[in-house]
A protein has these predicted regions:
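Membrane-proximal N-terminal amphipathic helix
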Residues: 26-52
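Short linear motifs centered on Gly/Pro in flexible linkers and helix caps
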Residues: 26, 32, 60, 106-108
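Active-site micro-motifs of SAM-dependent methyltransferase domains
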Residues: 11, 23-26, 46, 103
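Extracellular/periplasmic head regions of type IV pilus-like filament subunits
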Residues: 45-105
Length: 131
């Protein structure tokens, strides 16, 4: 009888540990996505300052090692669809780049980004032009 109680307690503790670990992993990946968005924003602002006040017109800048020496940031979790969604402006006056976070409601997509719309409860975290 005592052995069954001990086994049940161990099972409960293991279940709690696994759930806590999974939550920590999700938070860690979301933090990485937010940091990646800042890297992208900094690179685009550098592009702006070096190109007569124009932002990139398309995704070609993503492969430019001058702006992304370590390579363009990739989502920390392999996904069959892109987690990082760009929204370029053909007039080169603005940009918006968003990451789809795993934790809904933790984004800042109330920014006016046409690729995700105005969404205050979804999990998109966006950066946009600073100029």
């Amino acid at each position: 009888m005592e052995l069954l109680i001990v086994i049940a307690l161990i099972g409960i503790l293991v279940t709690m540990g696994v759930a806590s670990y999974s939550t920590a992993q999700v938070k860690s990946r979301d933090a990485r996505r937010k940091a990646d968005m800042k890297v992208i924003q900094n690179a685009f602002e550098q592009y702006y300052s070096e190109n007569d006040g124009d932002y990139p017109p398309d995704a070609s800048v993503e492969s430019d090692s001058a702006y992304f020496p370590g390579g363009f940031p990739k989502d920390p979790k392999p996904n069959p669809y892109p987690q990082y969604d760009p929204d370029y402006d053909s007039t080169q006056a603005l940009y918006c780049y968003c990451a789809d976070l795993e934790t809904d409601g933790s984004g800042n997509a109330d920014l006016d980004c046409t690729n995700v719309g105005s969404c205050t409860t979804c999990g998109y975290y966006c950066v946009r032009n600073l100029q």
